[in-house]
Amino acid sequence: MKYHLLKPLFLVSALLISTLQGVEHFWDEIPLSPSTTRPAEVLDDYWNSEFHRVNREVADAQKTQLIFLGDSITWSWSLGPETGKEIWENQFAAYKPINMGNSGDITPVMLHRVTRGNLDFADGQHPKVAVLLCGINNLGVSQSAGGREQWHLGSHCPPADIANGIRAIAQVFRRRLPGTRLIMMATLPVSDDGNRAKCRQASAINAALVRNDNEVAFVDLQDKFLLPDGSLNKQLFTDGTHLTAEGYRIWAKGIEPLILKFMEAPPLKPVKIMLIGDSVTEGLDSDGSYRRYMDGMLRREGHLIDFVGSRRQHNDDKTEPDNYEYDVDHEGHWGKDSAWMAENLPRLLASNVPDVAVIHLGTEDILSSNAAAESLTDGILQNIGKLVDALRAKNGNIRIVLSTIIPVKGKESVVSLLNLKISRYVQSNSTRQCQVVLADPHKGFDVSKDVSHDNPLPNAAGARKMARVFADVIHNTDLEGQTEKAEIRH
């Protein structure tokens, strides 16, 4: 068996290197593809019954420590024919496991499931370990039930697309269940030689991207299901794809040591980050949201994070629960000024208390007020001070990143004055216990290139610049135990 924990696959064939297309890290962005990485549902009674079964079990879960997400191979282990049920009970019953298998599932359908309830455990009920096995159906399914939605799948589905779909699901696990360690399984071999080769290629791509054993581990059991000549061991399969009792026994034995290790490991403690602001923080859409890019930047740098807040949407009226590309929780409030935030933040902190807060505030005040610059900026700063006081009252060790605001066309002088006062505030209000540090996205922000059509919201380029500034400040701030860093080897 092969565990890819801290050791990536360094010897990848030239074919696989070409399919990686610049992807070097588990947390790199995943290209959107209708065939493998765009969430989609199946509209038939069976699929929906299983989807809602899992949602009910998750909602009712009490001390569930282990979950399995997959397709019919996973489903059959405890819910199908009796081939694997005894093994399931003997190996995993003590963990009160939930079987999240659903027959026929392909990666875009599984993305729909994990972003629409299958991972919505109550606070305090998140499992310790999750096991993910999927991908094989991407090589066999061409359309949903009844042909309502066509997917470009089947034998021509590239291994890189399958790998991307699996990694997308894995990313959802880590974002939605940050305290749950994940075991990513290599896709098991099948009888068809061509598909078996593609399974190996897809698995090699993901094995090369899983670089630590603190949060995610990659387990490759493919060779355990093959004969010495490389052909399928038919004694382990009922039909060339699904497993016999002995096949399930091999799977259980292969992951048992890692499950035990993860169960006994110290709990993962993500840093809770609250992004506080107005329209700039909420964002016009996903592309123009700095939150999207900041999430990936921090994770690629090894930070174990969890964005927190009461909101999960942009101003385009599209809620974000289907979005697996970043953690969507925030406290950006469209059209609200600093006075509104100062008044309402204590209420919002009743549900979420962050370890780190990032404040970008003042843009709405400047856009909506004709007051003199001096009095206007003084008022904004007073409200920011109230936010800082409210945050410190909830968490005496909080780290606060206070940001200059990005340029506002036609309001350059008042923006400059506010940013000067923000800088001075930071210098005089940071303490050893409750650090306040400055982030300056205004510097280097080009209004001719980085602002969207809706002044002063950033476009994608501007949002990336903001995210880079905030991520760098958080990365370089002495968090004194506020953050855990994953053990990553490059």
Give the role of each language-model region.
Residues 63-65, 94-96, 125-130, 177-181, ...:
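Loop/turn elements at helix/coil->beta-strand transitions in domains of secreted/extracellular proteins
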Residues 8-18:
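Bacterial N-terminal signal peptides
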Residues 115, 135, 171-178, 211, ...:
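Sec-exported extracytoplasmic/periplasmic mature domains
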Residues 91-99, 117-129, 141-143, 152-183, ...:
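Preference for well-ordered, secondary-structure-rich cores of eukaryotic proteins
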Residues 133-139, 145-148, 170-204, 225-228, ...:
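Active-site segments of SGNH/GDSL-like serine hydrolases
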Residues 189-267, 323-328, 333, 406-490:
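Catalytic His-Asp segment of secreted/periplasmic serine-dependent ester chemistry enzymes
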Residues 27-168, 195-200, 280-382, 411-416, ...:
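Conserved SGNH/GDSL esterase-like catalytic core that processes O-acyl groups on lipids
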Residues 1-9:
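Bacterial N-terminal signal peptides that target proteins for export
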